[in-house]
Amino acid sequence: LYTIHYDVDIEKARAELQGSKTDMSFGENYIYAEAIIAAALYAREKYKGTGTPDFFCTPHLVNVMLLARDMNGRRIYNSKTDLAAALNVGNLYTAEQFEGKVRIDDEAHKHKLLGIFVNLADYTVGSTKGGEITRFDQFDIDFNQQKYLIETRISGALTRVYSAIALENPTDNI
């Protein structure tokens, strides 16, 4: 309910760019980047979050889009700023934790996570037991050092409906 799941259709982007001669004129990175940007912009039509969202994705996805080239070999996006402008986001952030994440929907289809658009102003962080913080300290005789550990438990959740977009690649053979 809080997250919009939107599939990226790479084959449709390949067909729209140049029909049957796409591979001769554009590289895979360009096709992939254009498919992601088109999906991101169409998904934003349903976005109900506040402000401008940021894009969180794997470092590999950022590299694929930055390495996209046109027919003459020139890069389409010269910097992360150009790429963020094309995606209509405030900033791009990399998250290695997204690598290999797969969601299985109600019909048992697999969707590989490509990235998440979210404005963290729509995300609320809280804690249990009034924000209880536990402190431990102990003297380590082997190293002649006093060691400290501070521990707390926190939780968080989106607080606005449709305030995040998860771009996914539908696939059943991962």
Q: Which role does the model predict for each range below?
A:
Residues 25, 32, 36, 58, ...:
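Alpha-helix initiation/capping motif
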Residues 15, 24, 28-30, 53, ...:
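Short non-domain terminal segments
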Residues 71-174:
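Sequence/fold signature of self-assembling virion shell proteins
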Residues 32-57, 66-79:
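Extended alpha-helical or coil "stalk/linker/tether" regions that are enriched in polar/charged
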Residues 54-68, 88-92, 133:
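Generic detector of multi-pass transmembrane helix bundles and their immediately adjacent loops
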Residues 14-16, 39-40, 47, 65-68, ...:
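Generic hydrophobic, helix-prone segments enriched in Leu/Val/Ile
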Residues 1-42, 166-174:
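Alpha-helical scaffold segments that mediate packing/assembly in large oligomeric complexes
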Residues 1-20, 46-60, 134-160:
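Long, contiguous amphipathic alpha-helices that act as assembly "spine/axial" helices in icosahedral shell
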